[in-house]
Design a protein with these regions (language model features):
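Transmembrane alpha-helices and adjacent helix-loop boundaries
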Residues: 4-190
């Protein structure tokens, strides 16, 4: 859910910045700066504790999804924008001179290369976001950290519970990292 919402938002934000859409570009830049320069924990607190003060109720799961999507969308947008800007302008000019439309140029020439260039940053951001879920327990959303704290409270085995937490994160993140390496190799352009 978070991933699909982020994919749409990050591509849209990156395209707005890349195409330099006048008013929307400033709005997107403001969103990216706000999101990237405030900690996820503060964003979660604002959503979970602040929004109900103005009549918008959220449960912990919605808070987690919205907070992670808000943060992740900005990081992914910047990763994709940097991939778009890494493409030499001559490639777009060449494609247009060969008779491709702007849409075809983006779809067949620019976007595949931008995805390839952006893939390492995308995967690093995915891993970063998965690790950021450890703060969800602050808004009563059960996550691995919440479970580890419960184990510590029940059995007073701090070292063992934290070691188990590390193993769980490795079991989750190592396959994601390997998938990222595989995707990077598969999408690499010569």
């Amino acid at each position: 859910l978070v991933g699909s919402e982020m994919c749409i938002r990050d591509r849209l934000c990156a395209a707005i910045q890349y195409e330099r859409v006048p008013v929307l570009r400033q709005i997107v830049a403001g969103y990216i700066e706000l999101s990237r320069n405030t900690p996820l924990l503060i964003q979660l607190f604002f959503i979970y504790y602040g929004l109900p003060k103005i009549g918008i109720k959220t449960d912990p799961a919605v808070c987690g999804v919205v907070g992670l999507a808000f943060l992740g969308g900005s990081y992914m947008a910047e990763a994709f924008r940097s991939g778009l800007e890494a493409i030499e302008p001559i490639q777009q000019e060449s494609a247009l001179s060969l008779g491709l439309t702007r849409g075809q140029t983006m779809r067949y020439v620019i976007l595949p290369q931008a995805m390839s260039i952006s893939m390492p940053a995308f995967m690093a951001n995915v891993i970063f976001l998965l690790k950021e879920t450890s703060v969800f327990s602050a808004v009563s959303l059960m996550d691995l950290m919440f479970t580890a704290k419960d184990l510590i409270a029940m059995y007073a085995k701090t070292t063992e519970a934290l070691a188990l937490l590390v193993v769980c994160y490795l079991l989750i993140l190592l396959p994601v990292s390997l998938l990222g390496s595989w995707l990077e190799r598969r999408l690499r352009y010569a």
